[in-house]
Amino acid sequence: RAFALEGDYGGCEQVNRYIHGGEGTAQEAAAAIGFSIYRTEEMAELISYMRQYNESALEGEDLRFYGFDMQRLSYSMRFLKESCKELEVDTTNLQKLVEGENWSSECDLSTRTETLTQVKKELESKNGSENAIHFVDILMQHSELQTLTNDDGATLRDQFMAENVQWILQQEQRNGHEKIFVTGHNSHVAKWGSFDSMGKLLSKDAANGYYVIGTDFYKTHCNMPTRSPEKRTIQVFYSHDPLAKAAKLAGFDIC
């Protein structure tokens, strides 16, 4: 039972560890996902439920939490370093790539790619290194994404997300699970669009095996952060989709 979210891969691994008995709180786990939209009571409640469910789940029937985005650095780098130490792979050059939660200004794309490629080669010679190798892939995706403009970056991000969803599915299939649940914004999961979205790429590979349920609204209230990190505000939004308005006028109050 795999739940894959449009959230940072490393941050979602932190959630996965929490729901399997790891330290911290559900709120801290939700914050690790990376986007402010997930720092809600509802997400914390979902994570708490998953942890509670796993406490009594049969072996192989536990809930697993994945992320397929690559826009954050810190958690993936932290877990990669941990894995390297466990597998006795030197992290000296890896340490030089980062300053705090960002790439070091002294290391350009070429340097980062060279270092990460070398680490990946060393990991490939080790048994049980598959998850560590994927952390390298996520970091290489993040590194490349930082060098691109908005339009090019958006297209590449969806390509990377599609690749990451495929990787997640492969991990699950090896354990006898043929289906995963993927959630993300409509523009990413949709099979159609003006560019090669994640959903369009996945539907080409999976054909009828990729099933999408899109959601929309006519009017909604949204609790959003202001420029001050400690303050939030309630904003009202209306959908531009005529079908959403038609549903509202037809009496579907949920819209």
List PLM regions with ranges:
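Trp/Phe/Arg-rich N-terminal binding region typifying the photolyase-homology
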Residues: 1-56
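Structural recognition of the beta-strand scaffold that forms the well-ordered cores
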Residues: 2-6, 64-67, 179-183, 211-214
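Flexible loop/turn segments at secondary-structure boundaries
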Residues: 10-13, 72-75, 187-192, 219-223
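Short secondary-structure boundary/capping segments
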Residues: 17-23, 78-87, 194-199, 225-234
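The substrate-binding groove and active-site-proximal loops of carbohydrate-active enzymes
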Residues: 29-41, 103-104, 110, 150-156
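Long, well-ordered, tryptophan-enriched scaffold segments
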Residues: 45, 49-52, 56-67, 71-152
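Alpha/beta-hydrolase fold catalytic core
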Residues: 129-180, 187
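C-terminal regions of proteins
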Residues: 155, 189-255
